[in-house]
């Protein structure tokens, strides 16, 4: 078993008996904030129903964190808590929660700057000396917010200085401008560079999808994130997975549930559907080794590579209409998979593919025979072939 899979297995094992008890291990799905601690008893069961495994909660005090973790444990949800005492009284805070059945990891900092490295390294090392079982969580900036041309330098600084067991970054590519969907041009470069960094260090990475519609204002460049459709979510989640992400995070839980009334939003079922698809495809993606990723289309995203030849000896021909596709060749448990994603989250695309020899499709309903060389990919969706 490679180092990455060992780390993933160790993290998943933390959830046994509470937050992740299933017959088959699946890609963990995390809701990032957006859940008031005083409503945790009501909201955590809804999170479980929606298909979430873990929640990252930012709390005003250790007492509030523990209360929320108690509610999470009852619902079968794991928690990555952040609260002031973790930094101010590290030894006492770790002692108070390290044996809690809901604990997954310790939240240290979201989107730190480069000058935060020294104190974060010290905090990380102190916590790991007190509790070597549960890892620490730090989430890094997207490239557009952190000097795109120096982004690799910045993420390498963190990877070299702070020995976290996994890496995390956020970028939300689906925006709306004048009523139309616009994909951030920086997104796939971010996936390329972050996944390459994680691979260099032999560790898994976690990535995001946007579940909460809102306006992003100053000091960031203005943007509007629309109410997510299934196509929007599929494009984000499946792109993350095709590049090798091992945990999918949603910002925020408030995208699925009105946390004031504790009522489900219309988007609840959309997110629930997306989560069911993540779990169904987990045998392909959990612990996978991404061999290569290419793009097709008249224009391909910045800093990606065009598919110039067939991705595998079994593929005779491959073409995708419309905006183009993301094509990922993966290996997992001795099996080889080819995943093809419609890079358009609004419109369908037509896939025309031909193979040499026996090939099967891996679907949400199981492995099936390939019935036709031509198939329609719904917005943002994927098809997976077992080669």
Regions found by a protein language model. Give the residues of each.
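Sec-dependent N-terminal signal peptides
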Residues: 5-14
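Glycan-processing catalytic domains of CAZymes
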Residues: 21-358, 363-387
């Amino acid at each position: 078993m490679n180092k990455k899979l060992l780390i993933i297995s160790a993290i998943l094992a933390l959830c046994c008996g509470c937050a992740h008890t299933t017959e088959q291990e699946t890609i963990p799905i995390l809701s990032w904030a957006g859940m008031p601690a005083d409503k945790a008893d009501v909201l955590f069961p809804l999170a479980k129903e929606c298909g979430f495994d873990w929640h990252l909660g930012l709390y005003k005090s250790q007492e509030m964190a523990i209360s929320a973790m108690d509610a999470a444990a009852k619902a079968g949800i794991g928690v990555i808590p952040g609260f002031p005492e973790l930094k101010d009284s590290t030894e006492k805070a770790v002692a108070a929660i390290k044996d809690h059945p809901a604990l997954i990891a310790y939240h240290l900092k979201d989107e730190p700057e480069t000058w935060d490295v020294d104190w974060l390294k010290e905090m990380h090392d102190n916590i790991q000396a007190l509790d070597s079982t549960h890892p620490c969580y730090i989430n890094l900036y997207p490239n557009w917010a952190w000097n795109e041309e120096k982004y690799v330098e910045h993420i390498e600084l963190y990877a070299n200085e702070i020995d976290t067991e996994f890496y995390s970054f956020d970028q939300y590519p689906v925006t709306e401008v004048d009523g139309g969907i616009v994909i951030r041009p920086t997104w796939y470069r971010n996936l390329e560079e972050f996944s390459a960094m994680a691979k260099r260090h032999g560790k898994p990475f976690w990535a995001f999808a946007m579940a909460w519609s809102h306006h992003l204002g100053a000091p960031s460049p203005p943007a509007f994130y629309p109410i997510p459709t299934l196509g929007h979510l599929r494009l984000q989640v499946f792109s993350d997975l095709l590049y090798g992400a091992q945990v999918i995070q949603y910002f925020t839980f408030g995208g699925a549930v009105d946390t004031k009334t504790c009522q489900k939003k219309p988007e609840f079922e959309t997110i629930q559907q997306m989560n069911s698809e993540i779990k169904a495809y987990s045998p392909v993606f959990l612990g996978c080794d991404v061999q290569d990723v290419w793009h097709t289309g008249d224009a391909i995203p910045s800093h990606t590579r065009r598919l110039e030849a067939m991705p595998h000896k079994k593929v005779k021909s491959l073409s995708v209409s419309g905006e183009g596709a993301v094509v990922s060749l993966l290996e997992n448990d001795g099996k080889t998979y080819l995943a093809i994603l419609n890079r358009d989250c609004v419109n369908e695309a037509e896939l025309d593919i031909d193979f040499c020899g026996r090939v099967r499709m891996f679907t949400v309903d199981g492995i099936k025979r390939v019935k036709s060389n031509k198939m329609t990919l719904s917005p943002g969706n994927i098809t997976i072939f077992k080669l």
